[in-house]
Amino acid sequence: MKNNSIRTVVATGIGAALFIIICIFVNIPIFGNTSIQLQYAVQVLFSVIFGSRSIIGFFMGFIGQVLKDGIQYGDISWAWVLASGITGLVIGLFGKKYDVTMGKFSVMSMIWFNLAQALGLLIAYGVVTPIGDKIQFAQAWSYLYAQSFVAGVANFITIAIGGTLLLAIYASSRTQSGSLTKG
């Protein structure tokens, strides 16, 4: 149990650090304070690899987004922090449907993965960010939903392409169970 705790803390710390670095240095602005964020593909990898501890995906996004907002903007948007965490959490919760640690990432696994990420993003950017920003910043609903929609779609595309590729590469690097036999 102790090793799992250490592994969880280390994975969360490394994941949050990668989240911040990628978010700050690799982003493509598209609308307001919204940009294409490639760190979500890496968050997916951590969320799935440590899926049985999906809390890693949550805290990687949560801590990473808090620190990124603080460093980059000097102000923290708690709704977007929660959205980043929820994205990692939901993807991790469904991780058994697309367990890449066994060396397989089939078409059906890819479909499950993208359905899970769509659900996570729908909750995060369809509900949490517009309502949270309305409470925190009192902005117009039309702006909030437009910004959340753009971010959700951009993140879906990023995760669908980048996340799927990272998971496929990771799966191909793992030994499939039963693939080693006596010759």
UniProtKB/Swiss-Prot annotation:
Similarity comment text for this entry: Belongs to the UPF0397 family.
Subcellular location: Cell membrane
A Pfam family it matches: ECF-ribofla_trS
Biological classification of the source: Bacteria, Bacillati, Bacillota, Bacilli, Lactobacillales
InterPro entries: ECF_substrate-spec-like, UPF0397
Gene Ontology CC, one term: plasma membrane
HAMAP family, alphabetized: UPF0397
Transmembrane segments: 11-31, 44-64, 74-94, 111-131, 149-169
Keywords associated with the record: Cell membrane, Membrane, Transmembrane, Transmembrane helix
Keyword Membrane: yes
Name assigned to this protein: UPF0397 protein stu0306/stu0307
Primary localization class, coarse: membrane
Membrane topology, from the record: Multi-pass membrane protein
